[in-house]
Amino acid sequence: MNQLIVRQLGVQPYEEIWHQMQDFTDNRNENTADEIWLVQHPSVFTQGSAGKPEHLLNPTNIPVVQTDRGGQITYHGEGQQVMYVLIDIKRLKAQGKDVSVRDLVTALEQCVVKTLADYGIEGYPKPDAPGVYINGKKICSLGLRIRQGRSFHGLAFNVNMDLTPFRNINPCGYAGLEMTQLKDYIAESEAQCDLVSPKLVAHFYNILGYNAQQIINK
């Protein structure tokens, strides 16, 4: 059985969840089910492993955390749906699925593209700049870390949030990159993380071919 466990964690501090992801990845074994963690974070900038300090344009009272995911600096805040994917890529390959790290990135991008399509919105990835875009504006950022063939970190999908803090950085290292969110395209009553997250999970589940799912609230 290829099971996917989905944990709904609510609003949690970034560093606490980050360290829990590291512990989970370090202590899992070949029988540990893959997991998705759905969470929102209080305001925080996170700097990826390739991050350059000059991409923080204006220091603020928002904390900056140096993390171990790929990529440059980004912002997390409430109203942004974060989906962390703790996936055993080695096991998927052993099951006959040709899944590389690039394939996992593509799967994450496609689950966002398909979720946007559910709302009648055309989103698309860029081959040279991971993430998902609408008319040149970025709505979803991606960053992964692979340790011993197992992934952690994931995607951050802007749903209904204050985008102002993004003005203090070059998002994902790109000067002048404009951010957007789902609320700009649909009714605010529909642009809610608890309505969007099941769509993200369902598309990810189908793209990677899981055949069982368990949902855990906190």
From Swiss-Prot:
GO process terms (BP): protein modification process
Residues noted as binding substrate in the record, renumbered to the chain: 69-76, 141-143, 154-156
Statement: the UniProt record of this protein carries the keyword Endoplasmic reticulum: no
Site (Lowers pKa of active site Cys): 138
InterPro entries per record: aa-tRNA-synth_II/BPL/LPL, BPL_LPL_catalytic, Octanoyltransferase, Octanoyltransferase_CS
Coiled coil: none
Location relative to the cell: Cytoplasm
Catalytic activity: octanoyl-[ACP] + L-lysyl-[protein] = N(6)-octanoyl-L-lysyl-[protein] + holo-[ACP] + H(+)
Domain BPL/LPL catalytic, first and last residues per copy: 30-212
Pathway: Protein modification; protein lipoylation via endogenous pathway; protein N(6)-(lipoyl)lysine from octanoyl-[acyl-carrier-protein]: step 1/2
GO molecular function: lipoyl(octanoyl) transferase activity
GO cellular component, one term: cytoplasm
Active-site residue list: 172 (acyl-thioester intermediate)
UniProt keywords, alphabetically: Acyltransferase, Cytoplasm, Transferase
A Pfam family: LplA-B_cat
EC nos: 2.3.1.181
Superkingdom of origin organism: Bacteria
Family: Belongs to the LipB family.
Classification via NCBIfam families: lipB, PRK14342.1
HAMAP family from the UniProt entry: LipB (MF_00013)
Remaining remarks: In the reaction, the free carboxyl group of octanoic acid is attached via an amide linkage to the epsilon-amino group of a specific lysine residue of lipoyl domains of lipoate-dependent enzymes.
Function: Catalyzes the transfer of endogenously produced octanoic acid from octanoyl-acyl-carrier-protein onto the lipoyl domains of lipoate-dependent enzymes. Lipoyl-ACP can also act as a substrate although octanoyl-ACP is likely to be the physiological substrate.
UniProt protein name: Octanoyltransferase
Native organism taxonomy: Bacteria, Pseudomonadati, Pseudomonadota, Gammaproteobacteria, Pasteurellales
Gene name linked to the record: lipB
